[in-house]
């Protein structure tokens, strides 16, 4: 076997391993949080970025193999950003044979009119986009709205809220809208961003860059994301441990009286489910072990560059 053939075989093996891991993670998230039920119509929000492409691709595969029946419709919100390649998503969606709808709303013009030059547009843009997507879901009869946020997004949101908002709050894997009419799910909740990056490169998704928000420097989220990436490089496994912590919360050892009845603690009473007193003990922490998921980087260990389209 030639060296080229060996390399291709290894890349195929690594891609299959990556694909299985992503499908397994999405399937587990759907099961753990009851994201998709029999008879659901899932509206997958497609932006043209790596995350939403991967989400749609994985859900389409699971649709063919799941023990339940559910429909998928892809929706893209064309916000009329200058230079947005309107042909890319329709061509891609038609090529894979999925039902889709392109919603055209000039939110870009509204944002530029309302937000002074140099200020962050994310908040207003997000509110406008959310309202339009909720309306579209109602029009399509969708029972679930699927977004492409992943594990790293959830961790970044947790730290953003701690650093700037004074809250222990992240992105929930499943939520209901304020009016109770829409259920939003995040099936990529267990997926690492670096896995999604590798998958998007291997699949050669026609990535569309975001010129509206991606060009804004010094965003708080970007600062937090860089911090997390630094930790991941310097301390492998730290992000996995932190995400595990989000799923293992001991309310009796936090400080929120709204969530735990500290005033109700009385002499001689033992409350079920509460960990014992560790006030005078040296806390023993056993490092968590995670499976080795090392694999070939499809970007040849260089900075990942997506194939952008115009």
Swiss-Prot record:
Q: Name one Pfam family in it.
A: ATP_bind_3
What does the record say about how the cofactor binds? Binds 1 [4Fe-4S] cluster per subunit. The cluster is chelated by three Cys residues, the fourth Fe has a free coordination site that may bind a sulfur atom transferred from the persulfide of IscS.
Q: Where is this motif: PP-loop motif?
A: 47-52
Q: Quick check: keyword Zinc-finger in the entry?
A: no
**Principal place of residence:** cytoplasm
> InterPro entries, per this entry?
Rossmann-like_a/b/a_fold, TilS/TtcA_N, tRNA_Cyd_32_2_STrfase, tRNA_thiolation_TtcA_Ctu1
Please state the Enzyme Commission number of this protein. 2.8.1.-
Binding residues annotated for [4Fe-4S] cluster, in chain numbering:
122, 125, 213
Print the miscellaneous field. The thiolation reaction likely consists of two steps: a first activation step by ATP to form an adenylated intermediate of the target base of tRNA, and a second nucleophilic substitution step of the sulfur (S) atom supplied by the hydrosulfide attached to the Fe-S cluster.
Biological role stated in the UniProt entry: Catalyzes the ATP-dependent 2-thiolation of cytidine in position 32 of tRNA, to form 2-thiocytidine (s(2)C32). The sulfur atoms are provided by the cysteine/cysteine desulfurase (IscS) system.
Protein name (Swiss-Prot/TrEMBL): tRNA-cytidine(32) 2-sulfurtransferase
**Species the sequence originates in:** Haemophilus influenzae (strain 86-028NP)
Gene name of the encoded protein: ttcA
